[in-house]
Amino acid sequence: MTQASLPWRHAALALAVVAVWGTNFVVIRIGLDHLPPLLFAALRFTFALLPAVFFIKRPNVPWRDLAAYGVLIGAGQFGLLYIAMTSHISPGLASLVVQSQAFFTVALAMGLTRERVKGFQYVALALAASGIAVILWRTDGSATPLGLMLVLTAGLSWAGGNIVARRSPDANMLGYVVWASLFSAPPLFALSFAFEGWPAIQHGILAADLATWAAVLWQSVGNTLFGYAVWGWLLARHPAATIAPMSLLVPVFGMAGSAIWLGEALPGWKLAAAGLVMTGLAVNVLWPRLRGRFAKVPPGADAPPAA
């Protein structure tokens, strides 16, 4: 790893990845115009797997971990997210609510690995939960209770995938995601056949236009291969404390992209809810680093000036 400060080229790369991940929610909405959600998710992971699996070495990870991650992220996170985004929640709100994964990850780590929850994490959770409550209370049709439940469950599945991935901290994440897709696509295809049916699958594929297939490829190549490859490259060269906080911008790009390209309204209550959730996320991610930084200031010395 190199210095904590990012060269501008590396910062631009990190912002590019965050922009891709955030505006990806707009791309999902475009793909869902013609494809059933489970089929769309299955195609996403099929093209993330093929042909990359023939060129990217399998990470030194147990098959059971790859299988668990593939099912949790594929069928759990994205399967449920795509279903929710058909008509139950707007792309902007989906990009925000799914960030609940950060708090579900803390809860699962506490329950499964006996990690101790810190006081600041309770504060962060309370702030984020308040934002979700605002969405439930003042929804304008851009989210239904079912949509929120589906996206929150998607966040829980994402958190489960995080816990599985943490068992292999040194694994190449791009290879991890590509090989785990081997266990994402088959169950999604099976669920699509079972719940969406062959007529809907056939109609979706035949009705899909160039924009739809571009959305599928963007999910696979842009969001998965480019995103994870560049993010992993940056994490290999800079401390995680420098790179990870930039992911807080994902819902910012998600809500802005949805407003610009899909015309999603951003009334005051929605911005307030976003502010609460984002503040909770920021406290969860940044507080330990800020506390550690200020702890290094000698007693009686002036604190560093605010930027």
Language-model regions: role of each:
Residues 31, 40, 44, 84, ...:
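Hydrophobic/aromatic residues within transmembrane alpha-helices
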Residues 46, 52, 108, 117-137, ...:
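Hydrophobic transmembrane alpha-helices of multi-pass small-molecule transport proteins
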Residues 15-23, 27, 67-87, 107-108, ...:
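Hydrophobic alpha-helical transmembrane segments of multi-pass membrane transport proteins
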Residues 6-10, 33-38, 42, 59-64, ...:
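Juxtamembrane helix-entry segments on the extracytoplasmic side of multipass membrane proteins
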Residues 49-52, 105-106, 111, 142-200, ...:
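Transmembrane alpha-helical segments that form core, pore/gating elements
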Residues 63-72, 117-129, 147-151, 171-181:
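Cytoplasmic-side transmembrane-helix entry/capping segments in multi-pass membrane proteins
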Residues 2-14, 120:
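N-terminal membrane topogenic signal
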Residues 39-43, 65, 93-96, 119-122, ...:
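Signature of the 12-TM Major Facilitator Superfamily
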